[in-house]
Amino acid sequence: RLYMLEVLPIQAKIEQEAICARCGVEYDADCMAYRATIDGFLTGICQFRMSDRGGVIRDLATVQGQTLNDRDRVESLFVLGRATLNFIDLCGVHRAFFDDAAFLRDNQGLVRSIGFTPEADGRWGMDLTDFFREPCKHG
């Protein structure tokens, strides 16, 4: 079946807070966020911020209690992650980190497919320089 997956920035903090609650993550007013929907139904959120070292994904999560099939779940999260990285890169920030330890525990393969790898200090990070110039190389 065909469906429409959309990933869009969340403009209003009140909406971000409500989506965080639905996804079981702590709302952080200092973070920016993207939301994912499939056919208009909310599927997930990515909260992130800019730091002095680079962009930082704080939370990547799907709606709690939702029965998404694995493909829809993975695709929603993958596109959320990549859209966030693209925004970070477009802001001229060419380093990114993945700091959602709880998500990482059960989803290392997905985090790797988004583009992150463990660094020497144990933190998962990546260099965004030219990453989106040839995105098919990173799929």
Report the location of each language-model feature.
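C-terminal "cap" of GNAT-fold acetyltransferases
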Residues: 114-139
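Short acidic/glycine-enriched loop/turn segments that link adjacent beta-strands
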Residues: 30, 51-53, 104-105
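Conserved donor-binding loop and adjoining core beta-sheet/short helix segment
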Residues: 37-75
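Conserved acetyl-CoA-binding loop-helix of GNAT-fold acetyltransferases
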Residues: 70-89
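Hydrophobic beta-strand residues of extracellular immunoglobulin-like
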Residues: 32-35
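Short amphipathic alpha-helix that is part of the acyltransferase structural core
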Residues: 1-28, 135-139
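Conserved active-site alpha-helix within GNAT-family acetyltransferase domains
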Residues: 101-121
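Conserved GNAT acetyl-CoA-binding A-motif
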Residues: 88-101
